[in-house]
Amino acid sequence: MLPTLVLVGRPNVGKSTLFNRLTGTRDALVHDLPGMTRDRHYGRGRIGGKPYLVVDTGGLEPVVKDGILAEMARQTLQAIDEADAIIFMVDARAGVTPQDKVIADRLRRVTSPVLLAVNKAEGMNRAVVTAEFHELGLGEPLAISGAHGDGIADLVAEALAPFPEEEEASDDFGVPKIALVGRPNVGKSTLVNALVGAERVIAFDQPGTTRDSIYVDFERGGKPYVLIDTAGVRRRGKVFETVEKFSVIKTLQAIEDANVVVLVLDARENISEQDAHLAGFVLETGRALVVAINKWDGLSAEQRDDVKRDIGRKLAFLDFARFNYISALKAKGLENLLKDIEAAHAAAFIKLSTPKLTRVLEMAVEQHAPPKNGLFRPKPRYAHQGGKNPPVIVLHGNALEGLRDDYKRYLESSFRKAFKLQGTPLRIQIKEDEGKNPFEGKKRAPLSESEATRMRRKKRVRRKVYGAD
């Protein structure tokens, strides 16, 4: 599983700015008002051969007993307990504050490594600016600037030092490894029990990690599956005696480790921002996806229409996924759900031959040629498969850097229809390996003496005829 870095610190020390720097995005809301990051935000990053997850917490205000700031602090404490490494951020310009001391006291009791990052240190002497932060007792402070990127590479390298480089992804078709994800109380626990059944549970902690994610082997209809259970710890013989809890870190890790993700939604609740964030993260990781709308029973026809409209409006970017309307409690719709899981798994690991891909590409171009972009019209010539889980299709041709996004979506749709790639994201990559100017980037060779003489002679003639160079 990918290591998880958790950013903690009091409000307004620059956690969201560092998050954006580490993930190359601007997903976290950045504002100068304390408390603007209300929920934990999460993303992926990479340094060298090491990918990682980043969780940006709300500001930790230990003195607040209730209200939204107390809820932010509670979520932060949960993230601290589950992190692989913690980056504790302080403000170089504000110095050590009483809140910093309280947070440091809490962090000294955790088992995960803690790195002390002194942010907003741009233009300042590093030795001087970090000196007073030694009193926090968290090791050597590291001066950084999230806004300017100073010291960020060293910070991340130190945080990831204990973790190995990413292993090459397997292309094996294997058994569907399913992660059920979703907000609390949408029915994940009930769905786990409905799918597995008490008599078939084989639960064990994943080796090599400190997580309490549970892997459950089960069979259904004679077919084997592996379920990654994020709904709560399940011990042998106590499958039904659990309280569902939501853990962002375990959920993100499960998505990374799965090859099919089932996003569970509550039909009686509107689609939330958290639902959309989870769906977007699944899309970003490239995992096959099936959506299960639970608690469908008991809704009127009018209510069902409202739910479908809400889904169509807020999850339109999941047009590749299949949607299942189920009742986990009454075990309705589960067979179709498993069929769609199988289909999504097969699509994610499909083998696509170069001749067939090229034939589909040629037919798509013949029906609708790429529009010109500037002086040249892009000319896709052939395609081959560049990866699985998700499938990657690499296009070759001339002037392909001019392919517009809408035309790439058209090609993606053509490939999906031809190969029935339902349930998995599809990546289109461009390889500009033909039709380039062979002299691009090369300097003109200096003129020989005779060439220079002829050039001067031509210039003299032009002056006599035209009166200028």
Curated annotation (Swiss-Prot):
The keyword Repeat applies. Residues 432-443 have a biased composition (Basic and acidic residues). It comes from the Bacteria. Residues 3-167, 176-349 form the EngA-type G domain. PANTHER family: GTPASE DER (PTHR43834:SF6). Residues 432-469 are annotated as: Disordered. The keyword Nucleotide-binding applies. NCBIfam families: GTPase_EngA (TIGR03594), small_GTP (TIGR00231). Residues 455-469 have a biased composition (Basic residues). Belongs to the TRAFAC class TrmE-Era-EngA-EngB-Septin-like GTPase superfamily. EngA (Der) GTPase family. One of its GO terms (molecular function) is ribosome binding. GTP 2 binds at residues 182-189, 229-233, 294-297. Residues 350-436 form the KH-like domain. Keywords: GTP-binding, Nucleotide-binding, Repeat, Ribosome biogenesis. Gene3D superfamilies: 3.30.300.20, P-loop containing nucleotide triphosphate hydrolases (3.40.50.300). InterPro entries: AAA+_ATPase, G_ENGA, GTP-bd, GTPase_Der, KH_dom-like, KH_dom-like_a/b, P-loop_NTPase, Small_GTP-bd. GTPase that plays an essential role in the late steps of ribosome biogenesis. One of its GO terms (biological process) is ribosome biogenesis. GTP 1 binds at residues 9-16, 56-60, 119-122. Associates with the 50S ribosomal subunit. This is GTPase Der.
